[in-house]
Amino acid sequence: MKKNTLAALILTTLSAGQLVSLQVHAAGQLNVWEDIKKSDGIKTAVSDFEKQYNVKVNVQEMPYAQQLEKLRLDGPAGIGPDVLVIPNDQLGGAVVQGLLSPLTLDQAKQDVFTPASINAFHMDNVLYGVPKAVETLVLIYNKDLIAQPLDSLQAWFDYSKKQREEGKYGLLAKFDQIYYSWGAIGPMGGYIFGKNDKGGFNPQDVGLNKPGAVEAVTFLKKFYAEKVFPAGILGDNGLNAIDSLFTEKKAAAVINGPWAFQPYEAAGINYGVVPLPTLPDGKPMSSFLGVKGYVVSTWSKDKALAQQFIEFINQPQYVKARYIATGEIPPLKAMIDDPVIKNDEKASAVAVQSARATAMPGIPEMGEVWGPANAALELSLTGKQDPQAALDGAEKQIKMQIEAMQASNQ
């Protein structure tokens, strides 16, 4: 066999947490696009991979949300990456457009990740990516205003009513947007899309008006009907209003994401972070999971080695190093109980909640859900329309928009 050809490549298996493989002798190089200011997190893994596989890995940084758009141009031109990072909500469009190569990863290797995170990179039961980092909603509370967070959403409602009697606020949340209210709707029986016979999403089956969804919205409605929430947190500027009330120490707690940690720290808030509370039926609130993942370009000249790279850098020791360097929460099951995360209040809360979360559907039709769902929630929660009627209207509107979108793509 010629020196400059691939001599041996055996896909790896994990045993006792270690990667077992025969060395691959490869000519050439791999080009990797990493997220901006995140390449330090994979520096050691890249160096070790280069030594073990006798290949040069070129790492270039760029914002992860822009990588797929750049791939559309650079891939066909032959100057694109072998491996890149994308958010899971871009997966569906990328697969439909033929931009990504499927991965071959046995079930045991998939099972080391939290189910929602690995499922986020499946489309029609085919795997296209390996999860790198997750973010999701958590409950953030001011330790100077409430010593211990409450366990249930009902308890938070009761506490918030008492706070209003004193001119203060208890818990605030943007429940008039599906991104935030999903935490109740999903566990109580609603769903965005049903499944098709391939195990993927069926965009013709919209479940936002099911009895469980109506029950959830009816429960959330009392936060507005009994004026536990101020009117100012409704609508497009509601998130800014919530942040202001929390940083001004007028609200004891908020439901928000890790992106709020730094601004709250800058405002001098002595805050704590915990997973979301439980619902009336005792189930914990869910949340939508945002996942960044490593994928392989369809234009990669060595797709097998590109996948080997992704597997290699996601071994536990490299995942831990990546977390320490970047602070991004990894969805590796073994890391949830690792002291480096478990002893970090913020990281632990995000990790635990991520395991309870639902990956946002990555199909293009998801884009047709947000507007009608949010409009129906605002109508319901403000009492302008009955929850069942509002959610029925949203389901009808979503289906109409999806039908129009699909027709325009034919």
PLM regions with names:
Residues 4, 9-11, 22-93, 107, ...:
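Conserved N-terminal structural module of periplasmic/extracytoplasmic solute-binding proteins
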Residues 88-138, 148-160, 165, 184, ...:
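Hinge/lid segment of periplasmic solute-binding proteins
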Residues 120, 274, 323-372, 379, ...:
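Long, aromatic- and glycine/proline-rich binding clefts that accommodate carbohydrate-like moieties
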Residues 105-113, 191-215, 266, 278-287, ...:
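Short, solvent-exposed loop/beta-turn-alpha elements that line the ligand-binding surface or hinge
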Residues 68-79, 97, 145, 158-162, ...:
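Short helices/loops that flank or line small-molecule/ion binding pockets
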Residues 47, 51-52, 125, 226-228, ...:
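Extracytoplasmic/periplasmic substrate-recognition and gating elements
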Residues 62-70, 89, 154-155, 233-247:
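Short helix-initiation/N-cap motifs at beta->coil->alpha
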Residues 160, 202-234:
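Glycine-centered hinge/linker elements that transmit conformational signals in sensory
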